[in-house]
From Swiss-Prot:
It comes from the Eukaryota. This is Glycine-rich domain-containing protein 2. The keyword Hydrolase does not apply. Keywords: Auxin signaling pathway, Stress response. Involved in development and stress responses, probably through an auxin-dependent mechanism. The keyword Cytoplasm does not apply. Induction: up-regulated upon auxin treatment. PANTHER family: ENOLASE (DUF1399), GLYCINE-RICH DOMAIN-CONTAINING PROTEIN 2. Disruption phenotype: Delayed growth and development. Late flowering and increased sensitivity to salt stress. Expressed in leaves, inflorescences, buds, flowers and immature siliques. GO terms for biological process: auxin-activated signaling pathway; cellular response to osmotic stress; regulation of auxin mediated signaling pathway; regulation of photoperiodism, flowering.
Length: 787
């Protein structure tokens, strides 16, 4: 039988695996729960976690045992307190140990049947009533702020697991960061994740039957579904016992991602076996490891002080117009070529580009063909707009074009029906030969993408001049001072958005300081966008205010932009903008990060980045575009005298921002250790570096995570990633030349990684990793097997 048909049959057989849970619906609830816990990070470590573990053992499990024995004790579903549910969540992610503990203390596995999550249910009042009746001295909801004063002697309990739940929680705490991007909740993405999870289990089943010892490592989409399945304890036990004869272990204790270690070889082996068995690529856009959880900007959650109106996104459109751009993440691999003339075998490569170049991807890149490169796996990872087509041109080593073909994005993304495809594309010969060639050259192309999402809006502040064409953006902060000069604001296409000017107010007192930011559109319309009254800046008809903060912390916020939302401005690149790899070449003093604090994001969400040196503002949210642009203009103007040093507060104050003594409202609780969000990462994934490189494309660098499990005859591990190149600098050491420069360096913007995809970035700008990725699936011996 043809190999491709065999691989299709294998995939179809894998999809027949019976799972007794609606994993797609359950995964959506799972994501909501992880988000709720992340808004209460005191549950990741410290006194609140210790108290939660005590309450879980002393109160929740006994209550659950009574309920599973007789649901009549509670009218309606049982709803666990958030803290108890979190510990329960982490306990169940060691399914073998959870099963053993439940059977030891309660004689049976305690399931979630009839239980509704604390974040999904609106019917917890009945559970609260039952809780108060059974535990009159213990509140249903844990007081996180005062948890430190409450006893938590777990060892004194009669029924208590010896499993180290503190470490279990710490290992799982970083997982949410890996699955928190918007596309993960997309139905098509989750449907494909469920299908890939079944294929993952199918590999394990086959390995057991053939006595192959392979430490299987899932990507993050698979791991999300795997976790979701384990949370349904009885279903997981029954489904896996039926499939492989035992409960599949999930061991997340191994976090060493070094070259040649178990995680590294495991991901390599899983990739090779997957692609050999199913004829599909294992690496998938949006499912790879994002890197270590960024360092938090605060360990104390922000508490909203009253309701605030939500900014209308249309407000900015009344003043400025800018293009709305969608973006997708793409992973591309050229798998094979057939009907290639013998004279060209082993000597070909592919040039790929977009038929409609855009602000994110506008260059031609080179990729090797896997089947023609002695097993060296080269994969391109990039972002682009979901428009036009990907164009491929097969080239010989003598730079001779052998033909071209293309793949349209609209085939899959308008609407989103499929997020990955692997197919043969017939080439159109560059030079017409025989009219009807019975065996045309064809390329096997594998591409995956994330669902389209809104791309950040990037505006550049440049000195006014006749034309920008053919020259680099001039930095806004140049030493030249021109009376009454305007600063042009242009978008990524170099289209003028508005002109800005700082000027003294006409009604200012002779010795007073009453300045204004004036905006002038091309049509001549004039707007007063901001006014300084001597104490702070008032923006956009007093809808926003900009002031300096008083924060003694070395890394605390420098400025506060408040209005319809609370935004704090920090020096350097923070959170999602945290520099990765080659992007570290830029000085952190060149940047400021805008971080929004809200009920949904009490620890802050990066919503914008100001590049002081090259005069640009990147806004991740539409509501930030206008106030962010005006604030950037003000801050750039005030800080330019200090050589971008944000520490010179006295000079800043003298230039128009008064220091405020008010502090953020915070919960009264012991500060969490920063290491909670940094070093305890045992799902350890790594790094989507969002730095733009020459040509506007984005280069992603990935490393392997380490959330591992072992299983006899089919060892399994945690989330994998892929190796890649780092981001690079553009014009003038990191800027972009007119928004349309050609690609140079950084491996041409394409990333390579071995089948392991493990832990090693491509060593710096321009370097590429090469690995043998697509050999026959190896039989990897493991030195330890857990029960």
């Amino acid at each position: 039988m043809d190999k491709e048909k065999e691989q299709t049959l294998e995939w179809n057989e894998a999809q027949k695996i019976d799972i007794s849970v609606d994993l797609l619906a359950a995964a959506k609830k799972h994501l909501l729960f992880l988000g709720a816990v992340d808004r209460n990070r005191c549950l990741y470590d410290g006194p609140a976690l210790q108290r939660a573990i005590y309450r879980y053992n002393a109160y929740w499990l006994p209550l659950l045992a009574q309920y599973t024995e007789s649901s009549s004790i509670c009218q309606g579903p049982l709803v666990p307190p958030l803290d108890c549910e979190w510990v329960w969540h982490c306990h169940r992610l060691n399914p073998v140990r959870y099963k053993t503990d439940c059977e030891q203390f309660y004689g049976r596995v305690l399931d979630n049947s009839g239980v509704v999550s604390s974040v999904n249910g609106n019917c917890k009042s009945q559970t609260e009533t039952l809780w108060k009746r059974l535990y009159p001295t213990e509140p249903y909801d844990l007081d996180f702020a005062n948890a430190i004063s409450e006893p938590a002697d777990v060892s004194a309990l009669e029924k208590c697991t010896t499993y180290d739940l503190v470490l279990a929680v710490k290992r799982q705490s970083p997982f949410f960061y890996q699955v928190s991007r918007a596309h993960v909740d997309n139905d098509v993405f989750l449907q494909e994740a469920v299908a890939r999870y079944k294929a993952f289990l199918y590999l394990i089943k086959g390995n057991r039957e053939r006595s192959i010892k392979l430490f299987c490592v899932p990507t993050y989409d698979i791991d999300l579904i795997w976790h979701t399945h384990q949370l349904h304890a009885i279903s997981y036990c029954n489904d896996l016992t039926k499939m492989i004869g035992k409960v599949l272990e999930h061991d997340d204790t191994d976090s060493d991602r070094s070259k040649g270690k178990k995680l590294d070889t495991g991901f390599s082996g899983t990739t090779a076996q997957w692609e050999e068995t199913f004829g599909r690529r294992y690496w998938k856009a949006g499912a790879m490891n994002r890197g270590n959880t960024p360092k938090p900007v605060t360990t104390s959650p922000y508490v909203c002080s009253g309701k605030k109106s939500i900014a209308k996104e249309e407000e900015s459109q009344n003043v400025i117009q800018y293009p709305e751009v969608k973006v997708i993440e793409v992973i591309l691999e050229i798998v094979g070529v057939k009907n290639l003339p013998d004279a060209h075998k082993g000597k070909v490569f592919v040039l790929f580009s977009k038929t409609q170049p855009d602000s994110l991807f506008n260059a031609e890149r080179r990729l090797t063909v896997l089947s023609e490169s002695c097993g060296e796996k080269q994969v391109a990872l990039f972002q682009c707009e979901p428009t036009g087509e990907l164009s491929f041109q097969l080239m010989s080593s003598k730079s001779k074009s052998l033909g071209f073909t293309s793949l349209s994005f609209s085939e899959f993304l308008s609407p989103v029906t499929k997020l990955s495809v692997e197919k043969w594309l017939e080439l159109t010969p560059t030079k017409r030969g025989k009219a009807d060639d019975p065996n045309p050259i064809s390329l096997r192309v594998a591409v995956s993408f994330t669902p389209p999402t809104r791309s950040p809006t990037v505006l550049h502040l440049v000195q006014a001049r006749p034309s920008l064409k053919g020259s680099c953006f001039l930095p806004m902060l140049r030493k030249v001072r021109l009376a009454k000069s305007f600063t042009r604001v242009v978008d990524e296409t170099e289209t003028e958005v508005i002109n800005l000017q700082m000027r003294n107010s006409n009604d200012a007192a002779p010795k007073g300081d009453r300045r204004q930011v004036i905006g002038v559109k091309e049509c001549g319309e004039t707007y007063v966008l901001a006014e300084y009254d001597g104490t702070f800046w008032s923006l956009l008809d007093s809808k926003w205010s900009l002031k300096q903060t008083c924060n003694p912390a070395t890394d605390g916020p420098l400025f506060e932009l408040s209005g319809t939302r609370m935004v704090k401005v920090y020096s350097g690149r923070k959170l999602e903008y945290e520099p990765k790899h080659c992007s570290k070449l830029r000085s952190e003093q060149d940047f400021m990060t805008a971080v929004e604090f809200s009920k949904q994001h009490p620890y802050g969400k990066a919503v914008g980045l100001l590049d002081l040196k090259f005069g640009s503002i990147e806004a991740n949210e539409k509501w930030l575009v206008l106030p962010g642009m005006v604030s950037s203009f003000i801050l750039s103007d005030l800080l330019k005298k200090e050589g971008f040093s944000a520490a010179a507060k006295d000079t800043v104050k003298a230039n128009g921002i008064t220091e405020e003594s008010t502090e953020i409202d915070v919960l009264s609780q012991e500060k969490l250790e920063e290491e909670t969000m940094m070093d305890v990462d045992t799902t350890t994934p790594v790094a989507v570096a969002a730095e733009k490189i020459n040509g506007g494309a984005r280069c992603f660098s990935k490393e392997l995570s380490g959330n591992m499990i072992e299983e006899e005859g089919g060892h399994c591990g945690g989330c994998g990633g892929c190796g890649g190149c780092g981001g690079g600098g553009g014009c003038g050491g990191g800027g972009r030349c007119g928004g349309m420069t050609k690609i140079e360096g950084c491996g041409g913007g394409s990333c390579t990684g071995g089948s392991t995809g493990c832990g090693n970035c491509g060593g710096g700008c321009g370097n590429m990793m090469k690995n043998n990725a697509n050999g026959n699936a190896p039989s990897v011996e493991n030195d330890a097997v857990t029960a």
